[in-house]
Amino acid sequence: MEEQVANAIEIAGNPSSDQTIKAQAFDYLNQLRADPSGWQVCLSLFTKTPRRSDVVRHVALEIINSATQTGLVDIQGLSFIKDNLLTYLQQMYGPDGAAQSDPSNIQNKIAQTITYLFSALYATEWNTFFDDILRLTYNGPDSGVRDNTLGIIFYLRVINSIHDEIGDVLVSRSRAEQDRANILKDLIRERDVQKLVTSWQDILSQWQERNDLIAEMCLRAIGSWVSWINISLVVNQTMLDLLFRQLARVKDVDLHQGGEKVRDAAIDVFTEIVGKKMKPADKIDMIVYLNLESIVAQLTASPPLHEHRFTSKYDTDLAETVTKLVNITTVDIVKALDSEDADNATKEKAEALLQAFLPHILRYFSDEYDEICSTAIPCVNELLSYLRKVAKRNPAIIPQQSAMLLPILKAIIQKMRYDETSSWGTEDDQMDEMEFQDLRKRLNVLQQIIASTNEQLYMDAVSEVVRATFHNVRQSGGQIDWRDLDLALHEMFLFGELAVRCGGLYTKNKPNNPASERLIEMMLMMVESDIRSFRHPATQLQFMEICVRYSSFFEHHARFIPGVLEGFLQLAHHQMTKVKVRSWYLFHRLVKHLRNYIGNVAQTVIAALGDLLTINAEVPVEGPDGDDMSSEDHEGSADALFNNQLYLFEAIGTICSTSSVPLDKQVVYAQSIMNPIFIDMERNLGAAKSHDERALLQIHHDIMALGTLAKGFSDWIPGTSSPAVPPAPEISEAFGQVAEATLVALESLKFSFSIRTAARAAFSRLIGVRGSHNLPQLPRWIDGLLTQTSSKDEMALFLRLLDQVIFGFKTEIYGILDTLLTPFLQRVFAGISEPTTGTDDEIQLAELKREYLNFLLMILNNDLGTVIISTTNQPIFETVITTIEHFAKDVDDFPTAKMAFLVLSRMSNLWGGPDVVQPSNPANGTTPSQSALPGFTQFMITRFSPLCWALPMNPSFNPKDAQAKQVLGEAAALQKIIYLKTGPEYVRWLRETELPGMGMGPDLVNEYVGSLEMLDIKGFRQFFQAFIQRFSA
């Protein structure tokens, strides 16, 4: 069997193995892994001589580890594995160890196995665990020193592995696993920790100059274990002398890599010591005792960090290691200052330490390497948050804080600057750019803390940077480093978080606050410096972003608008795709904000952007991994370019429809954009009918562009009280061509999902520009948009659009709605009745049900309810009621059931006639209604009332569920409405038929009917919810 297992492992691990045989090998090994006795053959495979291949032995150990972890091995089996592995360790790592040791990956895997055995056996069966492993560190039983290299390295691997298993706080553990880990740590502290610490001291003192790997591993062990053992075991003179000796390596300018790792590991030990949980007073005393400020000062002054700074020899690993120590120490100092448990003496010491550490904080926070700066951000955040807290408590102290805040703020601003090596916008620079922008966001958090602590200090510092930069731009004729200009613009952009936080730059034509006033000054300097002509793409983008963000500035300084518009139109043709595409979006945003201030520039804009309005659809190309390479996720892809090109169409629509442009010119300009698109649609229609993919996509793009142009022309939303006014009849007529062209394409190409999608978007946008002129075409829109192949999602989206139409044109739509309601609802019913084929389909079905019910509510709430019961639509009325009844009983979809009851309540209010019972609380009564629909009162009693019980009587119904309670509340409201409409007739039905039919006795019936009669709707909702809980119990 051993050979069989070994062969399976070899096949599974061989990249050139036949895939079928490889799959069989994996299946076999997985069966072996699950077999309670599978570990036995693996143990033999691992320990047997001659040694098997490394891959066989590695996988064999993995299977053993899996068995020990998952409980497949009993105590006897674990002891058997332990004995065999101890024998193996003695042979391989003991005094008479093999000439050729195991490779590192095998050693780590054995250490892991030994760790799992420790976890299982140390508490009860193997209390000599550490003695047995420590025995490997000697070359013989009589040896007085730990002189066995192989054994020492393996022992330290086990020590570090045990910490990972039971002591590492970053490892996620279940409650049971954490409890077991805590028990093991307690046992170690009780039994063996002293001998372990002594062994580390022995190893470090004997091997620190002889073997860097051993020294580093030993220091890593000390650093990790110190977090959960008694601090005095490490913070004592013997251990500290050993640690200081390793720190002295920092003076060695020719230190090799192994020595550097030892040095860094020694610093990490101090970081772990400081990170240990203690009372504030004890922590501050320990920081003083360790003389950490002096240690950091010496490390900072060392050649790798001082002399070699700003050179290629600068040791960034050492700098980051020291920064971690500075960071954790500063955090604890600040915590002591902020602690209510710390006495005055402790706080005085902490204050002195903070002043001493501030130069170190600034040194590493302002380091030119972003990784080092990032490591210091947590402590700077803690410090600034503390200073803000103190300032809010005692504003008089703010001036005193300036000495500390200003250098930190200057460091933040300087770190916001691109470094000298950055090459913005290149393909290779994308990851660095993302990381730098992330750093900027984190730095801005710190900057905003300072702004909220000392607003004046922040405003002065940023203003000075911006002022000096724009002065240099003017003095040098634009010949300054793009990084400096980008920094000033970036700070201007961020300044808005303070300047416009209360609604905008201006209030009643005056600056909103002092920060707004400063920002307006900066904006004046920016536009007067003519930085739009500065050619670096980063600053060009920043310029546009700022103009859009602070567009209200131009409302009060309209003289600058022509120049800014000219700059945007130039950048719309930028050679770099990133800038060009972004400029299209920002241009759209700018003209939307400044619509009333732009003036009659439509002809100029159309001429300038005309070459960018040519639509050229590209069929997505599938990449080698099957992904769509033209998706929106790829900057510069065909999809992304077109989606941004749409912003140009909307922007042109906005500019052409301003009040400054004569109406006849508006029509001319609109047609100048539309006509080429109509020609293009006609040219591609034949190929599209033949399902040509590119032609279909071209027409999709054409329709989207026309719809977006319409959106730009009109902000008007029918049925709302928005300040926008309906467009002039001439404009509506012009866009009638768009509606007709879209419908012609839709009627020919309704088999295409993308065409339907584009047409639906166009229909939505044409509502605002065409108004009620769209209504006669509604049957054609429905016929094209709701086809046999339309998805539930499409139906739901179109229902939402129809809601918009009904709301906007409630007084004009009745006749059309009466004609199209039956065929339209039949299509919706077909979609609802289709079987679902997966989770996504179920989600779409639920959405369609809710949109259908919302559509009915929209009709009922806008005085169009009679259309449902008109002569034309009478045949479908029963189906409408049946679907609502079905939804009201759906225990798996409470939101839909709730809406179903809302619809039934609204119908009852409208068609149930006037109230025959005066409500106990008129405010909670029903709304005035028309005369009763013949036969509807009986219909409510016999059809609607039983529905209120159908859902709660379902065995799966949980009346305590929050959503279920909401459904019960609506069911109660429906019963109350039926009672108000029918009075004694409903009471008699409940007493004689409905309630007894559910098994209720006279007392329950009396209680129920009495509550229905006496309580208002709100009270009865609460009663019904509680009653169902009692009745279901």
From Swiss-Prot:
Family to which this protein belongs:
Belongs to the exportin family.
Entry keyword Transport:
yes
- Mind telling me what this protein is named? Exportin-T
Mind telling me which Gene3D superfamilies this protein's record contains? Leucine-rich Repeat Variant (1.25.10.10)
What one GO molecular function would you report for this record? Answer: small GTPase binding
Database matches in InterPro entries: ARM-like (IPR011989), ARM-type_fold (IPR016024), Exportin-1/Importin-b-like (IPR013598), Exportin-T_C (IPR045546), XPOT (IPR040017)
Organism domain of life: Eukaryota
The subcellular localization recorded is: Nucleus; Cytoplasm
Q: What the protein does?
A: tRNA nucleus export receptor which facilitates tRNA translocation across the nuclear pore complex. Involved in pre-tRNA splicing, probably by affecting the interaction of pre-tRNA with splicing endonuclease.
What SUPFAM superfamilies does the record point to? ARM repeat
The UniProt keywords, alphabetically, are: Cytoplasm, Nucleus, RNA-binding, Transport, tRNA processing, tRNA-binding
Q: What Gene Ontology terms describe where this protein resides (cellular component)? A: cytoplasm; nuclear matrix; nuclear pore
A Pfam entry, by short name: Exportin-T
GO term, biological process aspect, one: tRNA re-export from nucleus
